[in-house]
């Protein structure tokens, strides 16, 4: 059980959050339709509270929690004694206590296990969407419940508590802005905004309207500062115009909404002609702005003043003379009067301590952080003015998750995506990159389309390896539905839950999509020079445009040549591109190269060794076989497999060089074969920067290649014999190479890779 919880803690918490609106709907239907006063919500959230306490104490064994939990228990005991001595209706008062202290207990517990889970903003957004949907549909169909029992107009859909639902929608409004800000899909964005506006305007309550305008105001401030700082006046103007259009639209439809009707009704009740007359009298301000909360505050203050000293210290509870007292609906005062000086101290000492720990390490580096801080401000402000935020379990849970979005975990979370781990250059390079990450600083996840391949067992043991399959079902509709479901599931639970994500397999659409969902700090790895893969600009652009490469933060190339070719077509993306070549494990290469193999080379022949995938679309291995045919002093070993192995074997027979060309197939350890070589040969039409170059340099082997490439540190022309792709020219050059000096040079690859690892860490930490 504990192992299961540890593995799925993020998903379990996320499911609780997503189920919350459904549970609240069941509660609303029970109370309003069947007159059954059974609150599913309370039971559901108490189960979650117990689960979180259990997990923090017994699964993750957080001993730091023993002291604050003891403080809570001691206070609860003194509070219960006070209720027994001076009050009545013990059960109702205990129920009130649980509701109020739900927030600090959940906050405390989740904060101390924050390093073990990550909740997606999309999870919160999904919960908000369900709340909006369960109000919007009944409102349109005219079958929902009324927000107010008398006088005022408003519809609450299938929910029961207007204050709590308003609070949830209000504090999640900035989270909705984050999702909309990032979304590239216009139609869903417009539909969501319209549904949101209809709901908050037809509910009839003030709180969501205030939250909307507050969020818009903060957004405008952010856009102004960003636009002026970056001198990007065009985008600034477009953004502000969009907000003005939104505000203008709200102004047009406002007179037809329940919110506006309620303002008119309230003014008529008070005998006023306009809103400005409200501010002429304190009583009117209290009635219109605070909904008489200040009057309730005075009444509760009188009860508190008359209470015994014990209750002043530990709280007067929630009943008086056998009847439930009216809450002030200003959370800070409700906590103080209901739980006394000691209860208030315990609640806020722990809450403010954790909040301070979180805020001292946060920054305002981007719009998302601005919006999360906006949600935090709304939680603080609305708790004071409207209540039902930190004293209502349904809103408390959402509030805690929002605040925890600001926390920093001990380790940054990195995600790499790939096709599979079958033997290949890209796959080996990915393994080596994972081996060069500092796991004291980073928690790394590798998601594969197919969790298979000979290299799977070589993945660093610290890496979490997962599989998200791409359906290839013959039924196109079923295939699309399955893939859409898997993408949606990933989006809901893992949207922006990583600090860095990298699409390592350039050609994979699935990897491309998952990478962009997982983080806002994204990278796209380009391992080949696609100028040679595609014959013209249109096809080249189609490849990169279909992957929406401009949406990435970083575009990483393994060679300068492939980077420059890319910039020839996309000069506007210059600030995004950089060159960072692949990693190799030099110690492993040298050690494994010493392993004994049965293969022996032909006496008095120069040995050429090729290592790679046998795919004629790029490798053009016939050139190497032709060299052996024309130059009798050469033999060729071919290490690898692929779709064109049969073609190459047939060509070998046609050239009658079977005695000097040997196909070894895939070798998990190719290095003993490379160690026996005189030359490592590559005769490709195109490559990025082949890992084989680095392996050959490590083994002090001469290189013969058709690819004169360079990376962030090495220009291969200084280390290799460059030959022509034209076979006639190539054969002449090969003949000359035989009589040349060895061209290999020693280079400290380990030193280079340490510098390269630092550059990667800079990307991870952005």
Where are these regions (language model features)?
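N-terminal signal-anchor transmembrane segment
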Residues: 1-58, 75-86, 138, 381
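Aromatic-anchored transmembrane helix interface
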Residues: 45-48, 69-80, 89-112, 122
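Alpha-helical transmembrane segments of multi-pass inner-membrane proteins
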Residues: 121-146, 160-225
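Long extracytoplasmic/lumenal interhelical loops at the membrane interface
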Residues: 156, 284-339
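Hydrophobic transmembrane alpha-helices and their immediate junctions
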Residues: 186, 225-228, 232-233, 338-380
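A membrane-periplasm/extracellular boundary helix in multi-pass inner-membrane enzymes
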Residues: 202, 223-281, 306-307
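Transmembrane alpha-helices of multi-pass inner-membrane enzymes
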Residues: 371-380, 388-410
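Aromatic "clamp/platform" in nucleotide-sugar-dependent glycosyltransferases that forms part
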Residues: 666, 685
